């Protein structure tokens, strides 16, 4: 009778240990991929005109390092709609021009536009999930801008000037490199 009870206790203990181990491993893998997604995305091939490092940064901003920089504010959407929203705002007050502040936003993805960048000249650019430009709007002229006329290299250089410090702060090699798993999860999205 006693040996039967010991066997049951041993089996239950082993099952609990295996369950806790599996949960820990799954948590570690997810947190590793989220926290180091900028590093991983810099080491994956991606389509032309895509800048996926900003997409990964904004998708996983809660897990990312948010360096304290003078006049830079990080703000998740708050209020009743913010509880269910995935919106996140990054303001760079250091590059204000004519009271226009550069803002990088992660939007809800209802219409395929996942990210928005407001420059300090009153222009708004929307990007898809791979961080390719989808549309542009000039708020001072109150008109759409043909994206074929946008110098995309200059635009991305400007975004890097305003928010590139976030990429640099989060481009760190992880202790356990899970690049193969990241590639398996995100390769199709960026190619």
Regions found by a protein language model. Name each.
Residues 1-25:
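N-terminal Sec-pathway targeting helices
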Residues 7-11, 30-32, 36-38, 177, ...:
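N-terminal first transmembrane alpha-helix
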Residues 12, 47, 64-67, 162-169, ...:
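Surface-exposed polar/charged interaction patches
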Residues 12-14, 72, 157:
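Exposed boundary/loop context
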Residues 19-108:
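N-terminal export/targeting and maturation segments
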Residues 75-191:
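Extracytoplasmic electrostatic interaction patches
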